[in-house]
Every structure is written in C-alpha cells, then in structure tokens.
Amino acid sequence: MRIFYPGDTGYDDERSGFQTGLRHEPQVIFAVENARDVEQAVHHAETRGLDHTVHTTGHGLTTPATGVLISTRRMNNVEIDPTTRTARAEAGAVWQQVIEQASPHGLAPLSGDASDVGVVGYTLGGGFSVLAREFGFASDRVRKTEKVGDVVTALEFDLLEIDQVHAGELHFDAEHAEAVFEAFHSWDLPDHVTPTLTTLGDVVRLTFASTRPFDVDHLRVAPTLIDEFGRKPFAEAAGKPLPPHTYQGDNVLLDDLPLDVLHRVRQAASNAGVPVFLGLMPLGGALKTEATHLLKLISPLLGVEQQHEEVFDEVRSFVVGRSRNFRYAVG
Ligand SMILES: Cc1cc2nc3c(=O)[nH]c(=O)nc-3n(C[C@H](O)[C@H](O)[C@H](O)COP(=O)(O)OP(=O)(O)OC[C@H]3O[C@@H](n4cnc5c(N)ncnc54)[C@H](O)[C@@H]3O)c2cc1C
C-alpha cells in the first residue's frame, strides 16, 4: 500500500477523479490494495478522530474529504463464476470490468448508463440500471457484502442471463421539447421497458432498453436528429465513459408527475439563467418503490444549488425522497 501526504508526488493524482470542479483535500491518502490496508486506514482515522471517505472514480463526489481518504482504485479485482451466475467485485472495480468478464458467458450485471462508474458506490445507492424497470435495483441482487466498518471491501452479486437487448435513442431539437415531453409522458409503458428523457442544451434525448421487443413509433412526434433503435449486445447499451468534467447535480423522487407540472419543470429548467439539464426516469415495474419518477438536474458548473432548488420547487408537493446516487458536488 502507498500512503500520500499533501505535497507528495502522486497526491494530486490520487485525490482526483471524474469530477474536475472539486477535489478531496485529505490530510492523508491510503491507496489501499486489500482489506487489511482498509483496516489500517480506518484505524488511523479512528485513533486520530478523523473522518474517513472512500474515493473510487470520483463520479459521486459530494463533499470533499478533509481527513483520511481511502483510495480504492488499486483494489479492483473482479471474479465471475458462470456456474452460480455471480460476480465478486472489489471496492475499486468499475462496471466495465464486470461487463467484459460476464459477457462471454451470456451474462450481464445491472449496471447503468456509464460503464466507468464504480460497482460499489453505484450499488450502495440502489443502482438504477439501464434495465431497471425490468429487473429492479442492482442492490436487490447483492448476495454478500464484505466490509471493514462502513467501508465495503467487496460485493458479491447475481448476474443475469442477458446477452442481447433491444435498445436505442431518439434525439430531437429542443424546439420540439413540448411535443416530445408530452409523447414521453403519455407512453403506455410496458413494465419491461426502461426509458429516460434527458435535455442537453439544444437537444432532447430519449433512451430506452429492454430484453424484450417494444415499440417507440409514438415517440417520433418531430423530426429526429438521431434515430437509432435495434437489437445489440448488452455492452453497447451500457454506456460509454465520458471525459472527466465539472458538474453539479441533485435529484428528487416523486410519487406523481402530472403533465402540466412536467411542463413547468421543463420551462423552469430552461429559464434558470444557467444551463440546467433535466433527466427523467419513470420508475415502477420491478423497481419496488413508492416513487413513480426520478427527476435529476445537472449543470456543467458549480454554485448552482439555488437554481436547482428553484426548479425542484415546481414538484415540491410530489417529493417523497431523494436517491443517494445522482448527487454531485452538493453537501
Ligand atoms: C456520468 C455518470 C453516470 C451515472 N449513471 C448512473 C446510472 O445509470 N445509475 C445509477 O444508479 N447511478 C449512476 N450514476 C451515479 C453513481 O452511481 C454515483 O455517483 C456513485 O456514487 C458513484 O460511485 P463511484 O465509486 O464511481 O464514485 P466515488 O465518487 O468514487 O464514490 C462516491 C461515494 O460512494 C461511496 N463509496 C464508494 N465506494 C465505496 C466503498 N467501497 N465503501 C463505502 N462507500 C463507498 C462513498 O460514499 C463515496 O464518497 C452516474 C454518475 C455519473 C457521474
């Protein structure tokens, strides 16, 4: 194991990650390689009255750590057992590793739309996969959790017999947003289909996936900029890594989202004065939760909590909770 203090060569690299707007500011970094190293790091923190925080990829950085940072990226072994259809992933493993090792066996994990996200961090937040409505939360599939205190050193979880999926995306110019939002909202959604709606500046993007066939014709309510839908290997639906960048974001879980409210949210996001991208995922199906929708906001800059809160004000009376995932650079 390597240990880094401020000023050491490698300290900056070790505390950096996908989020470039914020970095951890630890007194010491334990770059762990096994569970015994994690024990040592936790012991160091506890005996000195310091906080300890885990850093894997930095995708989910909320508040920068100031005490002990446990960097897990070297502790990233993944083992697949095709007989029992299980995977064991160490603390630093990312989904791409699991997908690559599982797919030759016709198996797949319940990973999300970015394959470079950490398996453990994602799963601890429930894990909304690209097939979430068909198969439930990633955390529903956990068989065994190995821990040192509150630090998960490895997870063992079920893989699913998934090879090909029906998946794709439609992109529209934002000038058609009202019609696209309406078509998305009125979709008589089969329980096996997992869709998302995302705004990205001038574009509204719809994505959808299932292991079973389904129809998206009714979503083509305006000319499409991208129209891609078909049968493909699960890995292709599992998202490509993005380059590191600066972003701030938060989310709410809702128990209803009437169309007029959705339109007000859309307008509030587009009138926020700063870029606010909106993400909407209908829940239900195999996701056993009282919430019917997950609404996410994300901006490519920091210091926009107030603008996000003003957009969330439009849905305040429907809020029943918040997902631990999809919270970025917020305390
Ligand atoms: C581009 C992008 C796409 C995403 N897509 C999805 C998606 O499709 N579905 C979804 O559900 N989520 C998604 N997320 C959210 C993601 O799952 C969370 O941000 C998650 O916390 C990232 O975990 P990490 O380990 O990669 O990040 P890190 O920033 O390294 O860790 C985040 C936090 O997770 C906890 N954590 C991580 N590892 C451990 C451990 N071993 N023991 C204890 N705690 C630990 C810690 O609290 C840590 O601070 C996405 C995020 C981004 C930025």
Language model feature labels by segment:
Residues 1-331:
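Soluble FAD-dependent oxygen oxidases
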